[in-house]
A protein has these predicted regions:
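Short beta-strand scaffold segments in enzyme catalytic cores
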Residues: 13-19, 131, 139-143
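Glycine-rich phosphate-binding loop plus the immediately following alpha-helix
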Residues: 146-190, 216-217, 221-225
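Conserved phosphate-binding/catalytic loops in two-lobed NTP-binding clefts
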Residues: 108-109, 283-305, 319
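N-terminal beta-alpha supersecondary unit
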Residues: 2-72, 78-82, 111, 115
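Conserved phosphate-binding catalytic cores of ATP/NTP-utilizing and phosphoryl-transfer enzymes
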Residues: 1, 109-130, 308
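A contiguous, well-structured pocket-lining segment that forms one wall/lid of small-molecule binding clefts
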Residues: 69, 184-266, 275-283, 288, ...
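DPxDG-like acidic metal-binding loop motif
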Residues: 83-102
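Glycine-rich beta-strand-to-loop/alpha-helix junction loops that act as flexible
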Residues: 78-81, 98, 135-137, 267-275
Length: 345
């Protein structure tokens, strides 16, 4: 079965066609980065206008690259949460209209389920496993029992790791997108130059949680206080030390989840899953089977949305055409699986 998936939750206009939840027939992503770089971040109004301008040609290109016409597609899917409301509405409205006009079943897909599924597009991964979902909006550690069944173990109590990367890059005028730039710049610096603080959340409900607001503040406003003797305060050293601290924070919480659950397969997803230091740090743990999506599937893409929708289709479910967009999802709670936060309606 072939599913056409649309993703427009932020600043990428994307469409892909995936067969049987695995075989990517086409995967088109139109990036808006050049339009947002001068503002050092995403401007929601610009993002939604570009989505409206690009959505039709992107969908047409996806069909063309797959050598299909719409009649040969079995279902239509689109992201409906979370994200920028204007951006979500463009892709969701287009997807619902396309499904209605073509007489195809429609599926609204949670963006975060998509990121968690991305690695499944190129790997056969049995459930359950420990999921690490790290992006510009989320930092989640979960026990993943199924494609739409995530048992949340820990999350950020303030900023996401991706947001911290972007804010640090913006303050030091490094450019946008911050995560990619810091990753590259860090290779020129020394991660031992600064000893930045990390929150002590070792017990009880916060055992698996992370926090990045304090780290972000230290890097931006108090860097001099954490500079080690014999090192210079260069942007490369700041980038390397910040990245090292952020990644070690994530990995330390992840290892706790591995120890407590006994699960040794770790699957990552989201934009920050492309970070080279995070990948290398996890690779050092030979006792783990760490699976990352290809770099092209770490960022926003339609293939992950189509992949998730295929499993809803196979299960005989559909989303009503009055499905709405939702900019935010309820605060993740420990033990919450696919109820409030991952609801599609």
């Amino acid at each position: 079965m072939k599913v056409l998936g649309i993703e427009s939750s932020c600043d990428e206009t994307a469409c892909a066609i995936v067969e049987d939840g695995k075989n990517i027939l086409s995967n088109v992503v139109a990036t808006q980065i050049p339009f947002h770089q001068i503002y050092k971040g995403v401007v929601p109004e610009i993002a939604s206008r570009k989505h409206a301008e690009w959505i039709l040609p992107v969908v047409r290109q996806a069909l063309s690259e797959a050598q299909l016409d719409l009649s040969q597609v079995d279902a239509i899917a689109a992201t409906n949460r979370p994200g920028l409301m204007g951006s979500l509405l463009v892709g969701l409205s287009f997807g619902k209209t396309l499904a209605w006009s073509a007489g195809k079943p429609f599926y609204a897909v949670n963006h975060m389920l998509g990121h968690m599924y991305a690695a499944h597009l190129v790997n056969d991964i049995p459930y359950p496993y420990i999921g690490l979902l790290v992006s510009g909006g989320h930092s989640i550690i979960a026990k993943v029992n199924g494609f739409d069944d995530l048992e949340i173990l820990g999350t950020t109590i303030d900023d996401s790791v991706g947001e911290a990367f972007d804010k640090v890059a913006k303050y030091y005028d490094l450019g946008y997108p911050g995560g990619v730039i810091i990753d590259k710049l860090a290779k020129e610096g020394d991660p031992k130059a600064f000893t930045f603080p990390v929150p002590k959340m070792d017990k009880g409900d916060h055992r698996y949680d992370v926090s990045f607001s304090g780290l972000k503040t230290a890097v931006i406003h108090q860097a001099d206080a954490f500079l080690n003797k014999g090192y210079e305060k260069t942007t490369a050293n700041i980038a390397a030390s910040f990245q090292e601290t952020a990644c070690r924070t994530l990995v330390s919480r992840l290892l706790r989840a591995v120890e407590d659950t006994g699960l040794t397969t770790v699957v990552a997803g989201g934009g920050v899953a492309a970070n080279s230091r995070l990948r290398a740090m996890l690779a050092e743990h030979k006792e783990l089977n760490c699976i990352f999506p290809p770099l092209k599937l770490c960022g926003d893409n339609g293939a992950m949305i189509a992949g998730v929708a295929y499993h809803f289709l196979k299960r005989g479910e559909t989303s009503p055409l009055n499905t709405t967009a939702c900019a935010r999802i309820p605060q993740f709670k420990r033990g919450l699986a696919n109820l409030e936060a991952f609801g599609r309606r």
